[in-house]
Amino acid sequence: MSESVSMSVPELLAIAVAALGGTRRRGQQEMAAAVAHAFETGEHLVVQAGTGTGKSLAYLVPAIIRALCDDAPVVVSTATIALQRQLVDRDLPQLVDSLTNALPRRPKFALLKGRRNYLCLNKIHNSVTASDHDDERPQEELFDPVAVTALGRDVQRLTAWASTTVSGDRDDLKPGVGDRSWSQVSVSARECLGVARCPFGSECFSERARGAAGLADVVVTNHALLAIDAVAESAVLPEHRLLVVDEAHELADRVTSVAAAELTSATLGMAARRITRLVDPKVTQRLQAASATFSSAIHDARPGRIDCLDDEMATYLSALRDAASAARSAIDTGSDTTTASVRAEAGAVLTEISDTASRILASFAPAIPDRSDVVWLEHEDNHESARAVLRVAPLSVAELLATQVFARATTVLTSATLTIGGSFDAMATAWGLTADTPWRGLDVGSPFQHAKSGILYVAAHLPPPGRDGSGSAEQLTEIAELITAAGGRTLGLFSSMRAARAATEAMRERLSTPVLCQGDDSTSTLVEKFTADAATSLFGTLSLWQGVDVPGPSLSLVLIDRIPFPRPDDPLLSARQRAVAARGGNGFMTVAASHAALLLAQGSGRLLRRVTDRGVVAVLDSRMATARYGEFLRASLPPFWQTTNATQVRAALRRLARADAKAH
């Protein structure tokens, strides 16, 4: 039943901020008012809210009000588990407590994830033993007693945990287990028997989570499940008319990942082994033969984007599609209830194979400019064995988002970094927000005084970076001098692990302060060590660009080794560049430069995490200052004071190090 809320958004926001010990922030108030207006008018809203704005309260307060008034849920989607946990474990409980006396009833909230994230009781009790899937394991592990016993121990622990856990949520298991172990006790949506057929349907952890979400006022989920809900034949999320997408800068990539598919020898072999006891041997032999021929072909073929499918590969894909489809039909005729779970799992894999092969074949029917999918072949080195993967992914997810997300719900998209080159247009285009769609962009700024707190230093005197990805001797000298001036306290963000490791080795020889490198330990442990010792530096690659939050004196220098353009041979992004060019646009600026600008904004955003932080972002790529696109890239970063004077920067870092030493 809908409720009447007598107090306004500004009034409730003020109560919440005061109760949580915060302070009034103009950007937060402006954002909350804009979110409330969007929910009222149905106009989509894109909000850039810098670190420190308090954006979660700015959208949660109007979301709760509308949920109570409309008696309908508001869905909040995030990219990362960390933000999900922050919302469900901290922000929402504190907010609900603070507003209890000001609202007609206590709001309810729930966390909902994809089915694979929850334990499957049917799989645990009816089909799981450590040896059940031995024939699906890599050959080298079948004879490794350590690997076998490790899997067995994990499965035993998971089975015991199933009888004590309330949620069955993988993220609640401490310590966690690897993907292979978790796959022994979980199922995908396709593998699920369904609540009506499953003997454990009434106890199902996933169904319980969906039930709780159906009763909630605010449902917290992730971009992957949001994408699954968009493409699924039946609804996964509760019916909703209002949606908030936090960490929206990741939305297009996460949706692309969900909409992608692949074919590998391992998947084909697993499918053949799963059906051995379920169907006529001739059906199995047909699938095995088609799989063997296809696997041999992709191992021998040249990796890279496939613009034209040759007749031979098309024949192999057709044979694979038909064999998988026939096997699926044979499984569906089975009626033995004792093998229902096994048949469901096998059927899911076969459907995936058949659908993916069909999709790849269909993608080559139209001419190149009109294609909606990109197909490419990768050869991955996995320890001692090579792995060939044929992948297909959408060229764009704009139409999917426009028709299946924005057409269904008024949407607020927010992040600290959404403008590229000073404009929302690039992001809006990637999402499918066009001039025909009612939307507006709003930048509420940041509580930080960037020009007084930070310096953007571009090392214009350095030679342009080489194609091999490794740093020049001049660049390594520059890194050593900057870290020495900063007294350690450096986060080094590199475009590749090769470059990060090379710089780490060089700095360990030259510097007296510790240098950690991604891969030395878990990322969380490395960040803890980095935070605990102000003299320590931490080098790494992409995950550190976006996932590190180190406020205070432990971080005063962010090093970026080169402009993070995508690889020229990246099949998906190069195809997108070509598609833009075919329409008369600038493919490099629209795709490659925008990709780099977003990563640069994310990386430089690691520097200032609270209003008292100070420091330098140093870009060791002279093209940032000399190339035509340099101004576009700089306009995408926070408004730091800018310089190319190395002497000034080193002096500033030394002053900052002395000041922090006195203060601490």
From Swiss-Prot:
Q: Which UniProt keywords apply?
A: 4Fe-4S, ATP-binding, DNA damage, DNA recombination, DNA repair, DNA-binding, Helicase, Hydrolase, Iron, Iron-sulfur, Isomerase, Metal-binding, Nucleotide-binding
- Miscellaneous comment as given in the Swiss-Prot or TrEMBL entry: Dimethyl sulfate protection studies on 3 short, promoter-derived oligonucleotides (18 to 46 bases long) suggest they form G4 DNA structures in vitro.
Q: Where is this motif: DEAH box?
A: 246-249
- Give the domain of life: Bacteria
Gene name of the encoded protein: dinG
**Which is an annotated GO molecular function term of this record?**
4 iron, 4 sulfur cluster binding
Q: What does the record give as cofactor?
A: [4Fe-4S] cluster
Q: Which PANTHER family match?
A: DNA REPAIR DEAD HELICASE RAD3/XP-D SUBFAMILY MEMBER, REGULATOR OF TELOMERE ELONGATION HELICASE 1
What are the Helicase ATP-binding domain coordinates in residue numbering? Answer: 14-290
Q: What does this protein do?
A: A structure-dependent 5'-3' DNA helicase that unwinds a number of substrates that resemble intermediates in DNA repair, recombination and replication. Requires 15-25 nucleotides of 3'-overhang single-stranded (ss)DNA for optimal activity. Unwinds 3'-flap and forked duplex DNA. Unwinds both lead and lagging strands in replication fork structures (may have branch migration activity). Has weak Holliday junction unwinding activity. In vitro at high concentrations also unwinds in a 3'-5' direction. Unwinds G4 DNA (planar arrays of 4 guanine bases stabilized by hydrogen bonds, parallel and antiparallel arrays were tested) with both 5'- and 3'- ss-tails.
Query: What family is this?
Result: Belongs to the helicase family. DinG subfamily.
Query: Where does the chain bind [4Fe-4S] cluster?
Result: C120, C192, C198, C204
What protein name does the entry list?
Answer: ATP-dependent helicase DinG
Which InterPro entries does the entry link to?
ATP-dep_Helicase_C, DEAD/DEAH_box_helicase_dom, DinG/Rad3-like, Helic_SF1/SF2_ATP-bd_DinG/Rad3, Helicase_ATP-bd, P-loop_NTPase
UniProt-listed Enzyme Commission number(s): 5.6.2.3
Q: Which GO terms describe its biological process?
A: DNA recombination; DNA repair
Q: Which reaction(s) are listed as its catalytic activity?
A: Couples ATP hydrolysis with the unwinding of duplex DNA at the replication fork by translocating in the 5'-3' direction. This creates two antiparallel DNA single strands (ssDNA). The leading ssDNA polymer is the template for DNA polymerase III holoenzyme which synthesizes a continuous strand; ATP + H2O = ADP + phosphate + H(+)
Listed binding positions for ATP are A49, G50, T51, G52, T53, G54, K55, S56
Organism classification, top ranks?
A: Bacteria, Bacillati, Actinomycetota, Actinomycetes, Mycobacteriales
- Known activity regulation? Helicase activity on G4 DNA is inhibited by porphyrin derivatives meso-tetra (N-methyl-4-pyridyl) porphine tetra tosylate (T4) and N-methyl mesoporphyrin IX (NMM). Helicase activity on forked duplexes is not inhibited by T4 or NMM.
